[in-house]
Amino acid sequence: MSRKSCVIGAGPNGLAAAIVLAQAGMQVDVLEAQSTPGGAARTLELTLPGFQHDFGSAVYPLGAGSPFFSSLPLSDHGLEWIHSPAPLAHPLDDGAAVMLERDLTETQSALAIDGPAWGRLVRPFVEHWSNFAPEILGPLRVVPRHPGLMARFGMVALQSAQSVARRLRSPRTRALFAGLAAHSFLSLDEPLSAAFAVLMAVSAHAVGWPIPRGGGQSLTNALCSFLSTLKGRVITSSPVQNLASLADYELFLCDLTPRQLIEVGGQRLSESYRRQLGSYRYGAAAFKVDYALHGPIPWKSSDCLRAATVHLGGSFEEIAASEKAVRSGQHSDRPFVLLTQPSLFDHSRAPAGKHTAWAYCHVPNGSRVNMLDKLESQIERFAPGFRDCVLARRVISPSDLESMDANLVGGDIGGGVVDLRQFLFRPTWRHYATSAKDIYICSASTPPGGGVHGMCGYHAAETALSSLGRR
């Protein structure tokens, strides 16, 4: 008889873990507290009827590039990736926009004087993506499978974005690099902030920054559908208060952050391990707004209409100042804003002729400050008349994010700070294993961290199976 396992949380990592266990022949139930599976990968009507908004994640470079997701027949279960003509636009105050094109050579040409430097930064990893992705989307190995490639990445990754940006001569290229680095939620003068910039750029050139047709829920639904073919079950509206109440299961994989794991694991976890989890640090938060629009955003630069993702923040120096303020517990007067406009490329997101947009800025964890005016001022700066396009808006504060997904602690959408210490010990030196032999953690608080890629769940499940002698 196959062993019965339980995955707590039906986010992408929980579903990935469940699929790995089911593929190994285990019985799997996935228990999800919310009425809809997906965690932060859900699509909901948040403004007006007929307008579909991604609650959390919206653009999926690491989803499309995930070694595990790529191994699954998700297209047979309804997943369709849509690529905008350009992955990213970064408008500037002169009315032009710096474009990150899918084609690396085209991007190098557009960056002119910085084209060669851009190529040196990213080309080795773009050309060897099939080797690079499994390395970067997993726990740090003492001896990498591709040591030369990873040594080259490490030489850049351990630096700050500020340091690496000194190689770039044009303010336009430096601005582009700053926006990419800001995905780290770190100050741009901190170690590892360069790693995020390079990874985001590499993924754009290697696999693109696609959106799922119909929204992030389509990825979730495809994962659930495939899991069902393996006889796995997803049971929604089933919050778990304590593992002691789940006596029918022999193995637990928890798509939970350390704070929730302490509560759910209770006395099943050793006191010393609970203490380690208790010292885990959460990062800056997102202040998010969803928009129903009567037309496309009126960008000064029409190039912005070619990209599903737009970075709003101006120069490197301005973005660096904004991120440094947030990291110091302050609120920026000119915040870096990340905006997506999926309905330009996926007409299923809004009624005919109408559009949706999604934008957030960074704020300190747990912030209660209303950043709506400052966020919209940044959009208006590069798209005058934007406010006149708004039919309805839904503000989602950090506390709202957490209430809609308990893993988004204080509004942290990345599963915890990714500074050097917490990068190495995420969430502890054990990574996926806990002090209990039958309990594992598989959330974004484990390697490789945030992003929708399922690799935290994949590696956690593989670790659990190895401990059972099934690998």
Describe the function of each predicted region:
Residues 199-244:
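Helical element adjacent to the flavin cofactor pocket in flavoenzyme catalytic cores
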Residues 57-62, 182-186, 286-288, 345-346, ...:
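Glycine-rich phosphate/pyrophosphate-binding beta-alpha loops
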Residues 174-187, 333-338, 385-447:
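A glycine-rich dinucleotide-binding beta-alpha-beta segment and adjacent secondary-structure elements
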Residues 238-350:
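Mid-domain catalytic core of redox enzymes
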Residues 442-468:
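A conserved FAD-binding loop/helix module that cradles the flavin
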Residues 93-192:
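Rossmann-like flavin
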Residues 3-130, 417:
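N-terminal glycine-rich phosphate/pyrophosphate-binding loop and immediately adjacent elements
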Residues 1-6, 23-24, 204, 420-426, ...:
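Extreme N-terminal leader/targeting segments of oxidoreductases
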